[in-house]
Each structure stands twice: as structure tokens, then as C-alpha cells.
């Protein structure tokens, strides 16, 4: 395998490793080459990214390498964040999000028991909007996935912690879980 192909594969590995990044030792195992050769290639790639007119750079934090955007383009990334998304959240997604927020960690089956209908599509939408994520697995038959809210959920609603959620009275808990967020969620998702 030549150097160009090694760089191409490393570039892909950096991409798929995401924010977690990747250790040179992991790259070495994948490419079946020595660790010091991986470091040399990564350093070459860093210089290539710095010198070129590219939007990404390769950064190293605590022995982990990952892609990052260049700081000089930050104002453009901020503009993108401020553009409203075309896809809005459905009422089913809003109801499901409220249930997750108040009952997390919670399984899909538990959500469906509360809502009385399937939640598959709503869950997919909420995960794709980064408002909820898998938090682990429940004990019991089938070890179902547990869902909970994300940091993006807190940021979207201006909450520091889940303790900042409005309290629910016991008698209205199931009826009003979704209603608490409808107004603000519909505004955000427009």
C-alpha cells in the first residue's frame, strides 16, 4: 500500500471516529503498519491541511487525533446554526421528547405505554435532531435500549440541568408532559 492510499484511509478513519477521535495505535492496527509510521503520516497530513485552503484541520488532544474545523471560519458555522431547519418536529415527536425529558432513562416500550401509540418514527426524528440519545440498556428480557436527553436538548431549551425543567403536578403529569414544551419546541423547529 503506498503513502497516498494510507493517507486516504487515515482520512476516512479520522472522519468516522468523529469527535471521539482515534489513537495512532488504532490506525496502526487497521493499516498493519508501525505506530511511528502512523505518527509521521499524521504529521504530514496536518501540514497539508494547514497549507491548503481547506475547512478542516487535524488536531491532537491527549494522544488522540481528530478532524476539527478551522477557527477562522467560525462565523460561517455560526450562521449555519442560526438558519432554521426545514424539517420541523411533529406533534408525536414533541410528545415523545417531553416523555423522555421527564421520565429518562426510558425504553421505547415505556414511551409507547404512556402515549398509547408506536414511537419508532418520533424516536428516529429526535435522535437525528440530536435531542435524545441511547443511554444504555435496561435489565430484563431483550435488554431494551434506554433513551435520555442530550446536551443539545438542554442548550435548545436554555436549561443548565434537567432540574430546571418545569415541575409537574402528580394528577396532570401524564396529560401535561408534552404540553409544557409544545410552544417553545414548535417555535424552535419552524
Swiss-Prot record:
Localisation: Cytoplasm
**Any one of the GO BP annotations:** cell division
Q: Which InterPro entries match?
A: ScpB_csome_segregation, WH-like_DNA-bd_sf, WH_DNA-bd_sf
Q: Which Gene3D superfamilies match?
A: Winged helix-like DNA-binding domain superfamily/Winged helix DNA-binding domain
Q: Which UniProt keywords apply?
A: Cell cycle, Cell division, Chromosome partition, Cytoplasm
UniProt xrefs under Pfam families:
SMC_ScpB
GO CC annotations on file: cytoplasm
Name the family: Belongs to the ScpB family.
**Matching HAMAP family, A to Z?**
ScpB (MF_01804)
Q: What does this protein do?
A: Participates in chromosomal partition during cell division. May act via the formation of a condensin-like complex containing Smc and ScpA that pull DNA away from mid-cell into both cell halves.
**Subunit structure and binding partners:** Homodimer. Homodimerization may be required to stabilize the binding of ScpA to the Smc head domains. Component of a cohesin-like complex composed of ScpA, ScpB and the Smc homodimer, in which ScpA and ScpB bind to the head domain of Smc. The presence of the three proteins is required for the association of the complex with DNA.
Q: What is this protein called?
A: Segregation and condensation protein B
Lineage summary: Bacteria, Bacillati, Bacillota, Bacilli, Bacillales
